[in-house]
Amino acid sequence: MSQYRRYFDESDPNQSRYSSRNGNGSYYQSRGSQRYNYEGQPDESGYRKDYQKSLGAGNGQYNNRQYSRNDNGSSNNVPQGRYTPTEYSSRRSFHHNDAEIKLPSAPSRVQYSYKARNSETKDPNAYRPNHTDQSYIRGRNSNGKSYGPVNIPTGPQQSRIVSNRNHNQHNVSLRPKATVKYKNIEQLTCKYHYFDPVEKVLTHRTEMKKWTEVNKDMPEVGFVVQQETINGQVKSVIKSRKPDEKSTDPRKTTIPNTGNSSTKKKQRTARKCRKELTLVPRISYDKFSLGPPPSTEVVVFAENFSNTQMANIPDISIKNYFRKFGELAHFASYSDPKTALPLHLYLVKYTHPSGKINDSAKAAYQAVKSCQEQKCCILGCNFNVLLNKNNELENIMNKRITVLSKETEKVKLQMEQEKKSALKKSAELNKEEKGILKPLKTIPGDLRPIVNNRPALYISRRFISVMGLRLIDFKSKLKAYKCSRFLEHATGFYIIFNNLEHAKLCMDAESGKLTMASRRKRTTVPINFILIEPFTSRFSKKYKDVPSDSKEKVEIVRYNNKEELIDAASKYIIEDLAKTLHTEIRKTMIGPAVFDTLQPSNFPQLVQKRKEQEELKKADMEKKKAEQAKSKDFNIFNLYASYTNKPKRRQKRYLSDEEAEEELPQKKIKPLAHLLDEVREDSPTSGLESTDDPTEGDNMSTSSSSEDEDDIMDDFQNEDKKDDMFSTPETNEEMDYHHKIDYRTENLIDKEIDDASQVNERYLPSATQFPVTVYPENTYDSEYIDTVSLFDLQDAIKDEEDMEFLKECLPAGEDLEFDDDNGLLEYRIWKIKQMADISQSSTNNELRLNNQTLDKTLFEKNIPFIASEFKHIPEKLKSSYLPHKRRVHEPLNTVSHHNESKEQSPDIAIKEKSVNKADTGEGSLAEISSSRDNRASNRRFQQNIEAQKAATGTESELLSLNQLNKRKKPVTFARSAIHNWGLYALEPINAKEMVIEYVGERIRQPVAEMRERRYIKNGIGSSYLFRIDEHTVIDATKKGGIARFINHCCEPSCTAKIIKVGGKRRIVIYALRDIAANEELTYDYKFERETDAEERLPCLCGAPSCKGFLN
């Protein structure tokens, strides 16, 4: 084996020279001519070998290749000939004098044919071997071994050439065509000793130097590395190269044994001959390394990705498994881009805190090595691990996508076959139910006003009830057609159309072809419609189709040739262009010109005239308003008359159009008595107190003093002066007339005031719309009060008149019987009044703190509350002192939010509650919108699950459980107004929506009975046993969710349904009606009625239709 060193010849810049370490030859390489010369020393046979090679194009075949062998000596009686190359084949052979010699298969062998030449011909390329029966054919078999000498026969006999080194024969593929793998990569071109295979030039040749310039101790002819024994150890030594020495095979060289004297005779070779390839030690990657950097990415993929257990493995488990080998920089999982199904293919990329690529590559290598030695098993599933080299990730991904596409096609075919079989079964069922579909020619009488003689499609009630169909199913299936209404009747379903054509179109397209899922038969059933056309008679109006939104059918115009088509198209285009041109001319030219000519600045005379007219109109309006402003009389005896009297004759008022447009809204007419209640801003003082209630103001006005009335009159006089200042001047006659009226009214008012001052203020007349009592009504006058206390009687006597009436009612003083009071009657009356005041104050305190008085049965007679013994308080009495017990039918806000403003009196809280109730309009819209969003998200989630089921072809329990968990609503538990704890909704829930699942321990019926007795014995007051069927019971007493806190109510808001999920029965709570936020959820327990009265449980729901007992 020769080891070559490279140096440069300064004379030829395009040449590089290699020299072998044994010095028997040199190798020149010229990149310009692609010529390879080997000049060797004469060997034992005296041959000199010259090789010339020129590559040609064409499917990997070598053309124009010539091998010649010239000998220095000559020998007689030896056949002379020429070897010419032929095409490649898997079995190579020599042809010599009609004798075929077959050689073993080798990838680098060429088939030769030998032709004997005439001795008279002179061929410069003739071959005259030195030996008549032996020649060397050089090559390698599939195991890399060299072939030895081959015997070439001289006769027509046939023999097989056998290798002296290896007798094995293998099928070896052809060597692939050489390509430039790493081309134009910056990571490679920046290397110091990179050779560009395209340009055939060393990129950094100008920067290179001879080794003698770098290290002068190195010899100029080169050096070789030899192994010598130094101090009993074999070491590698660098020595100067000797070109005259012959090279030796290192496998044949031996090294003397340095062991004991008994084993000195044995010699050992420098190294053993390897029979198979071994791994090259991993070399650290640096700036001098060739090729791409080592891979830091690991590809993880499942062995069997169609396994159903793979869906249960989360990505975090795989990520955590490979995290133990090093720090992760990136983790990604891949899925099918078409079906979105997981490929169970993952990419793990490592990094290192130091940023060195060798450390990251080492971590990836260790991950692959450990997974190859021990199988990578994660949660019971096996995975394969490979380094991401040569686009390994893309190859695996493409293979898996193709496999998945084939599987989805198979699933689709199976589904189509199942659908066809279901259609056949439904057709058979349809034949059996032929008697069900009886044609109905007319619409029932109660529906005729609604249908209004329009076409309809009919489905019989018997068919619907047998198949278990609903009207909402038809709405969703026929939404593509223009249906007017969907009606449900005792006779069946009616689908109304506005147009007969639409009804016939739906009938032809869907009748017998539309399929729906039957809830009773558990199969798809075809739907057959019956068309009911509108009736016509000579007595009724002829039916006319209701105009629809659909456009009329356009007749198809056919043209004979291309010219007619072009003419018609050009005609339509010209018409459209003409229309658009006219509209543009109107918009851009005519319109602006008209507006410019009609501007007011072009007609100044008309503008001035219009302004003058408007000024005259304003003057007339002000004059009329001044004439209508008249003085008003103020007479206290005409207050009620002024309020009730109306003008006898309504005077007509004719206004012009402009006045009618500018007419202001009329003010409400007030009686003159209300002038006393008005407070002027310009008056410094007011004679009346301002109150919110008008009746109170009226009462206060009657009790005002005469001095206040004088002040009021002064104020009115001042106001009249102000009105005179801004009013128009009147004539002398009008002034005299008004002066006389004012003088008379003033005299009358003074006289009446003097008369009224002699009467008690309480009995003066009041200026109110309706009569008002002098004293407030007494509470004992109510029909619901039977007894009258002493204090009520004292309050009833207001004046002397009442005392006289009392004397008339009671008997005479002689007939009265009095007990012996011993002079303590007044004390007793005082004591009774004091006790009454104390009870009234305690009642007021209870109302202020509790908003309700305590039940009297809670207090024992003549015994203090502290001295009373412990006793059980019934649930009915708890509502008197527990606030949450009183709000049975109101939403209970159980979610506590910290708010300091809530720490206030109950009166303020009640006011805020009323304000919140008034402002629920926008909140309800927000709740509806949020619920609508939830339903939309649930529908999208359901569609995704159905798509995944259709793609995989299997329905796993995991999908059903995820679907069930997705649909549940947010609920919580808190203290209940019915009993103990209760379940409450945190957000609005619509009717027929799922609320929560009743979760617990699944047990048998005998075990449930035993546990129930045990719970009663241990003192557990509430047991949460829910029966599914005769044999199965759900026990949520100790192992269950919060659904067990839901209470019973005779008017429930929810209901319990038993559904199947994955072959198992489950209990799910659904809403019966719309439920508000923070409202308690209830459902009917439906206990069996007990005959024994002692075992019956009282119901505490408090509903209007409460049964009174649970069982």
UniProtKB/Swiss-Prot annotation:
Residues reported in the UniProt entry to bind S-adenosyl-L-methionine: Y1085
GO molecular function annotation: histone H3K4 trimethyltransferase activity; methyltransferase activity; RNA binding
Keyword Protein biosynthesis set for record: no
Sequence ranges assigned to domain SET in this UniProt record: 969-1086
Keywords: Chromatin regulator, Chromosome, Methyltransferase, Nucleus, S-adenosyl-L-methionine, Transferase
SUPFAM superfamilies per the UniProt record, alphabetical: SET domain
Ranges where the Post-SET domain occurs: 1095-1111
Residue positions of motif RxxxRR motif: 935-940
GO cellular component terms, semicolon-separated: chromosome, telomeric region; Set1C/COMPASS complex
UniProt feature, compositional bias: Basic and acidic residues: 241-252, 897-920
Catalytic activity: L-lysyl(4)-[histone H3] + 3 S-adenosyl-L-methionine = N(6),N(6),N(6)-trimethyl-L-lysyl(4)-[histone H3] + 3 S-adenosyl-L-homocysteine + 3 H(+); N(6)-methyl-L-lysyl(4)-[histone H3] + S-adenosyl-L-methionine = N(6),N(6)-dimethyl-L-lysyl(4)-[histone H3] + S-adenosyl-L-homocysteine + H(+); N(6),N(6)-dimethyl-L-lysyl(4)-[histone H3] + S-adenosyl-L-methionine = N(6),N(6),N(6)-trimethyl-L-lysyl(4)-[histone H3] + S-adenosyl-L-homocysteine + H(+)
Keyword Transferase: yes
Pfam families the UniProt entry points to: N-SET, SET, SET1_RBD, SET_assoc
UniProt superkingdom: Eukaryota
UniProt-listed Gene3D superfamilies: 3.30.70.330, SET domain
Feature: compositional bias, Polar residues: 13-36, 60-79, 132-145
InterPro entries in the record: COMPASS_Set1_N-SET, Nucleotide-bd_a/b_plait_sf, Post-SET_dom, Set1-like, Set1_fungi, SET1_RBD, SET_assoc, SET_dom
Quaternary structure, from the entry: Component of the Set1C/COMPASS complex.
Domain notes: The RxxxRR motif forms an adapter helix that bridges the nucleosome and ubiquitin.
Name of the protein in its database record: Histone-lysine N-methyltransferase, H3 lysine-4 specific
Organism for this UniProt entry: Candida glabrata (strain ATCC 2001 / BCRC 20586 / JCM 3761 / NBRC 0622 / NRRL Y-65 / CBS 138)
